[in-house]
């Protein structure tokens, strides 16, 4: 089963679920029409490493029964977790790792270069 919601509605649902579990500084990047592997990237900060796993577990628990497919997850480091939903990529960072890797700058540059 796969969800029949639009990508916009799926993003809103993901944001709501992350906010329910105290995910912070949620940003969404629209990469539609760009030379990138997904249409949307969502970045969220977790308070600490264990919180990262709690956020990802909450997403899986709530979204899988609704038809969302998690094609892959990267969970080796609690400082940076990744969930691949096919056309949406979710990055869950601890604040220090989010600042260190500054994925937002890369994504904004990618968006601006194709404007």
Task: Provide a role label for each language-model segment.
Residues 1-38, 47-81, 88, 95-97, ...:
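Polybasic/polar functional segments that serve as interface/processing modules
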Residues 99-102:
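Switch/connector loops and helix/strand junctions flanking conserved nucleotide-binding motifs
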């Amino acid at each position: 089963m796969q969800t029949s919601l639009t990508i916009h509605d799926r993003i809103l649902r993901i944001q709501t679920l992350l906010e329910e579990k105290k995910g912070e500084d949620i940003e969404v990047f629209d990469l539609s029409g760009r030379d990138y592997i997904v249409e949307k990237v969502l970045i969220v900060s977790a308070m600490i490493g264990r919180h990262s796993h709690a956020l990802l577990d909450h997403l899986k628990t709530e979204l899988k029964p609704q038809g969302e497919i998690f094609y892959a997850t990267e969970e080796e480091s609690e400082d940076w977790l990744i969930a691949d939903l096919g056309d949406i990529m979710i990055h869950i960072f601890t604040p220090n790792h989010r600042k260190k890797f500054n994925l937002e700058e890369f994504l904004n540059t990618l968006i601006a270069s194709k404007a």
